[in-house]
A protein has these predicted regions:
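Sec-dependent bacterial lipoprotein signal peptides
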Residues: 1-15
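Mixed-charge, low-complexity intrinsically disordered regions
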Residues: 15-154, 165-174
Length: 174
C-alpha cells in the first residue's frame, strides 16, 4: 500500500507540461497609438514556466521573468528617415518550484537525564533562487518611410501612419 502511494506521489510530482516561453505585448494592438520623441513604441515582456524538480512546468502556473524587447522612437534623421532604438534585455534565473515555494523546516531532539536536559536543533532552508538581468543589447536603426511604412520587431508588426519631428502615430499588429 505504501509503495503504491509513493509511486503515485512521484508520478504526480513529475506531471506538468514541458516548459514554454510566453511573449506579452504591453500595448494594445489594432488601434491607433501616438508617442513622442524618446517615447516607447512597443514593449514585449517574456516569461517562461517555472520549472519543477523534474524539469517540467509548475502545476500551479508559476512564471519566471525572462526579460523584454522595447522599441523607442528617436525622431527624424537629417535625411528624413525615422530613427528607432530597440533594446533587448534577457535574464538568467536559478528559480525553481523548490526555491519559490519551499520553506524552512526545523527538527528538535531533546533528552532529559535526571534534572539536566540536552538537545539539538537542525534547520533546513530551501535553496534560494535568483534572477539577474544581463547587460542590455541596444541597436539604433533608421527606416525610409517613403519606401515602406511597416516593419517587424519581436514578432510585432509596426505600421507607421504619420511621423513628425516630435511625434509618431502608428498601429501595432500581433
Amino acid at each position: 500500500m505504501r509503495i503504491s502511494i509513493l509511486a503515485l506521489v512521484v508520478a504526480l510530482a513529475g506531471c506538468g507540461a514541458t516548459l514554454q516561453t510566453y511573449d506579452r505585448l504591453t500595448q494594445e494592438s489594432d488601434r491607433e497609438i501616438m508617442t513622442h520623441v524618446g517615447g516607447q513604441v512597443l514593449k514585449v515582456k517574456r516569461t517562461t514556466d517555472l520549472p519543477n524538480a523534474f524539469g517540467n512546468a509548475d502545476i500551479f502556473g508559476g512564471k519566471v521573468d525572462r526579460g523584454f524587447t522595447e522599441l523607442r522612437f528617436q525622431g527624424i534623421a537629417q535625411d528624413g528617415r525615422a530613427v528607432f532604438r530597440v533594446t533587448e534585455i534577457e535574464t538568467q534565473s536559478t528559480e525553481t518550484t523548490m526555491s519559490r515555494y519551499g520553506g524552512s523546516k526545523s527538527k528538535m531532539d531533546a533528552q532529559l537525564i535526571g534534572n539536566r536536559m540536552s538537545g539539538t536543533v537542525t534547520t533546513y532552508d530551501a535553496p534560494r533562487g535568483s534572477t539577474e538581468m544581463l547587460p542590455p543589447n541596444t541597436t539604433q536603426f533608421a527606416i525610409d518611410l517613403n519606401k515602406s511604412k511597416e516593419f517587424t520587431v519581436a514578432g510585432v508588426k509596426v505600421r507607421v501612419l504619420a511621423v513628425t519631428e516630435t511625434s509618431l502615430t502608428y498601429v501595432l499588429q500581433r
